[in-house]
Curated annotation (Swiss-Prot):
Gene name of the record: infB
Alphabetical keyword list: Cytoplasm, GTP-binding, Initiation factor, Nucleotide-binding, Protein biosynthesis
Name of the protein this chain belongs to: Translation initiation factor IF-2
Organism: Streptococcus thermophilus (strain CNRZ 1066)
Superkingdom classification of source: Bacteria
Gene3D superfamilies: 1.10.10.2480, P-loop containing nucleotide triphosphate hydrolases (3.40.50.300), Translation factors (2.40.30.10), Translation initiation factor IF- 2, domain 3 (3.40.50.10050)
Amino acid sequence: MSKKRLYEIAKEVGVESKVIVAKAQELGLSVKSHSSSVEEADANRITSSLKAGTAKDESKPAPKATPTPKEEKVEPKVDKASVAKSAPAKETSKAEVKEASVALKKPKSRNFKAEREARAKAEAERRKNGGGRDNRNRNQQGNDQGKRHNNDRRNQKGNGQGDHNKGNRDNSTNHDRNFQGKLRNDQNQNNRRDNARNNQAGPRIDLKARAAALKAEQNAEYSRQSETRFREEKAAEQRRAKEQEKARKEKQQAEVAVQKAAAETKPAPKPAPVAPQSAPTAQVQDTRRKKVRPNKSRDNRRVNEDGPKQTRNNKWNNQNQVRNQRNSNWNKNKNKKGKNNRGNSAPKPVTERKFHELPKEFEYTEGMTVAEIAKRIKREPAEIVKKLFMMGVMATQNQSLDGDTIELLMVDYGIEATKKEEVDNADIERFFVDEDYLNKDAMVERAPVVTIMGHVDHGKTTLLDTLRNSRVATGEAGGITQHIGAYQIEEGGKKITFLDTPGHAAFTSMRARGASVTDITVLIVAADDGVMPQTIEAINHSKAAGVPIIVAINKIDKPDANPERVIGELAEHGVISTAWGGDSEFVEISAKFGQNIEELLETILLVAEVEELKADPTVRAIGTVIEARLDKGKGAVATLLVQQGTLNVQDPIVVGNTFGRVRAMTNDLGRRIKTAGPSAPVSITGLNEAPMAGDHFAVYEDEKAARAAGEERAKRALMKQRQQTHRVSLDNLFDTLKAGEMKTVNVIIKADVQGSVEALAASLLKIDVEGVRVNVVHSAVGAINESDITLAEASDAVVIGFNVRPTPQARQQAETDEVEIRLHSIIYKVIEEIEDAMKGMLDPEFEEKIIGEAVIRETFKVSKVGTIGGFMVTNGKITRDSSARVIRDGVVIFDGKLASLKHYKDDVKEVGNAQEGGLTIENYNDIKVDDVIEAYIMEEIKR
């Protein structure tokens, strides 16, 4: 009997796969997932049970809506009086609930209710004794009397000195009485406090508990005194403000009176009466000046009969004198500006420092100064310096303190100290590991990132080419993929992002990077070749990254294809098919003819649905660099894969050890876009330098922060590189001496993309030839320039160009300085050539000789022929039997042979300098205007 997969049954019935899995498990079938297979009879049982359950649900009648009984609608009769009585209770309960909620919101503080009850109890005892009442009455009488005298003196303008002194004596007498009453009250209060402490004192049982109680009592006492002092200062400040306001109003009234008097005296016809009118004023001024100043000094030194000298009344005396002086207009030069009139204005009252409560928590950083701590806890630096001195720490207000000292200081103040965690702004990795960076409520489904991996020439690029309906594979030199590419396709309304990784052994690091950012791995295995070394390596990378594997057995159209052998070989390496009880999906395809491609895409979407891939598009974008290169006109170009967030044009970005702003952004089709969401591959420009492939990137809030982070990362990378020094030890002494005797092959590597530079350098360093080693003097991205030739001449190195060409100036300088330039487009040929040269087996029988260059001026597409390029020879000549390279923007696009060469309509063997002609190239039709055609021949060298 045939078997069926559970997801096929789900498609037939029209339900989700998980429903079928649950029903199968309910029927007792041993299934694990939607990919499990069952017999046809079991499939019929599952289908019939599902249909029976659906029919049973439909047969159930819909529940009728039960009408609300009428008794519930009838409102009961309620007594209005009872309602009126219950209303205040409800209001009271609401108020109590409100007060309780407010009390819960407030921070825990002292028990003011208990303190009020204690004060009320003490007041009742004082009233019962009667002593406090007499003092209060006497104080009140003295205050009233002093107020009456002071008011009388304020209302009288220009009175004599005798009345003024009388008012001062009355005030001083009243103040003496107030002072004596206050002394008695303080004494009673101290007695009550001592009695209370004596009553509370008990036998000491636990020293720690007693110490804690004493400390709590001291804190409570300190809080009470602080609050009392704060209230007294606030009341005194309010009194001073009222007095100043009153003095200001009196001054305004006096000025208005003077202006009225001046207005009345102005229209007098004769100036003679004016002198007698001002004479008494001057006389009063002179007498006032003579009387006031000596009396003022005597009053300050006077000792009262009832007690010691009192200083509070002097404030009232001084204010009265200032008012009298203003009213009498005795200082005529008061309003004049000058050096001698600075002290004429009344001194401003000194504002006392406000009292602030100590904070309950204090967040500190290592190295805070005493002044910073004092500002944070609202205390004087001198107070903190004193506390530190008592703790045995000598410090000034500008001295930094360590964390332990700050914590001890906060314990002394009774404040909970916590250390502030310093956030490294230059650390990009924190965005990838911090769970709080993403908003879980804003998570949406994202497209899966699929990496196509496999051995060399097993059909990875051909499969991707079939998926994209393009011809990427035909443009690859030697038929292998040189660097990673990212593309996005759409299947059934859902997008899938594909990463194409190279299969050559030199690109191990690039495959590892591809596996680290992927969600699903599609392992391509040729049905005729089976499992190869890079296939095993791809399996290990996928297992290390923890991503599911979908095996695509390719080339099933070949006669010698054996898919069963491939399944058995993969099972030996831990990749077991679901048909054999494993968890890996196997799909047999033919990438060349497009066979079973739809089934492969459906399997990818099915596995992605099981993985439940989510992303937050609302945060700032983070992701990974897929590839980076230097473009002649655009500068540094980086291919990025957005993993979280949304990337926008003009975003400040930090990529690896460089930074910049996103100037332009294009998708995989070359179209300019403004935004890119999660799982989208984009190519951006605007970076200062080309980053390394595999670096992480993150978008920052502004360009200033991005610049600071990028410069800091570059500085750290440089310091790390400088610290990598090779120290001589006994273990490596022999190796060091041996290395001095070895011959060295110095090379300079220039490639088109960063990934190829890394792979080529790593492969050359791995070449193991006894007595010879490779030293990579310099490696970079871009065309070969004059500085590379200069460096090669100084270090006696060979310049290796991978998919790049030297500039004309560099080529001329290389010929002058006799520097060897090796140009290649296939990586294993570079490795073989360097290895043969190191072994002394290189046989330089032929040398490449460039015979001419031409520029494409126009292109013509002819059916059954291809693209014809109309060219003009700019240097040398183009021959029919020569090989040709297509160079675009300094990068080799294609290398092949000429298919035809014509001058006008005639077939010719060569076209000379400054002549025009037409040509076609074998197996290449992507000729464009301004492409450079470089013709060369392989010439035998005399040994």
